[in-house]
Amino acid sequence: MKVKLILMFVFLLSVLSVAQQSKLITVIGDSLVGRMVNGESTREVYGNVVLTQGKVKITCNKAIQYISRNEAELIGDVIATKDTLTIKTPHGYYFGNLEKTKSTSGVYLDDKKVILTADSGEYYFNEDRAFFQSKVKLYDTTTTLTSNQLTYYQQQNRAVAVGDVLIFDGENQIFADTLEHFRNSKITFAFSNVRLINLKNNSEIFGQHLEDYRQKGYSLIDREPLFIQVDTTFATNDDGTESVQLDTLFIKSRIMEAFRDSSERFLAIDSVKILKEKFASVNDLTIFYRDEERIVTSKINSVSAQPVLWNEDSQLTGDSITIYLKDNKIKQLDVDGSSFMLSQNENYLNRYDQTSSAQIKLFFNQGKIFRAEFYGNVFSIYYMYDGETANGLTKSNSASTTVIFENNEVTEVKLYKDPASEYYPEKQVTGNEKDYLLPRFVVHKNKPTKIEMYNLLNKLK
């Protein structure tokens, strides 16, 4: 029994010795000089230097080998290889016990999948992991990524970047404080101070967390998202000259989704606020079909609040509101389901023209309303004016109504099918304006403003 134990012990020692020897680095070259430095044995190897450890091979002009530490300093045209991996640097260091190489003199890595460069870097051969710092740049055939720090997991085709991160694929740019990118699946997760720029449609999305699935053409922003799209328009001045105007679309919500497919859809979900030139909206759900220049807002269930839309002095509510754009200006606006429209007079602020119906269609020219059509059980109250002098009001109802506008003022009202109309003189109306309100009349006070949106933008920037 004792003999067996002794033999087993000797065998284990021999295995351990072989394992330790297999981790020892070997350095050869044209010439070798042995030295004792501070009591430590070193070897300086010159000319056609080759360092090997297992599958790792490093060539350079000169190496200083620290024998007891199993380490070596590598000087001049350093090239490290393992399988398809190549690392280049003018000056580096190799840690045999850790199977790690390090350089602070500029590093270049190529594994036939990506190219990675930085001011300094480390590579762990036993883990197939790189850690690069300062002016980091990773690129392949479709994507370029830059950052202050980056960890690259070669076998996983995964990169984790930290600090001033930017990833660019030719059409989209993503900025973030931290970013995780999976090369094969083209999936990216971005965290903190996120900014997604689409160069194709000149739009930007800000937020604190983003998920981007490039192969699916889908992005999700679910923390403090803000969408911005700036359009350049030309306005004709009174003297016939043209001036450039910037028309910015703001959309704020709790969650945003972007689909980069044939429909080019953009979704804003929950607590949505929209602001663009002279119109604004609050709603539960907005779908923006960018290629079709169509925006649809709606409530998400039967008990939720209706979307509200403001256009200049008018306010509209309904179960859904569809905005049709042409050259980034409103062309048509449809309100469906329990529709209500009110317009405040700029000179008599307590007087509102009001219309309730099942459906409303508004038509615009150069951004100004010129016709409104109301369908389904239409009830209306319109205030009358003699010039700028108040002159009573008219209450009416019909199956459908058409209203003609000039300079945003009602000039003609046409009633169709079973019309009924009643006029109330000014002396009966003055001071009693609150008595002339249709059911469902509500003036909403939560209209988004430019100050609110720009303050939010400055906070996110």
Language-model features: where?
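N-terminal amphipathic/hydrophobic interface segments
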Residues: 20-461
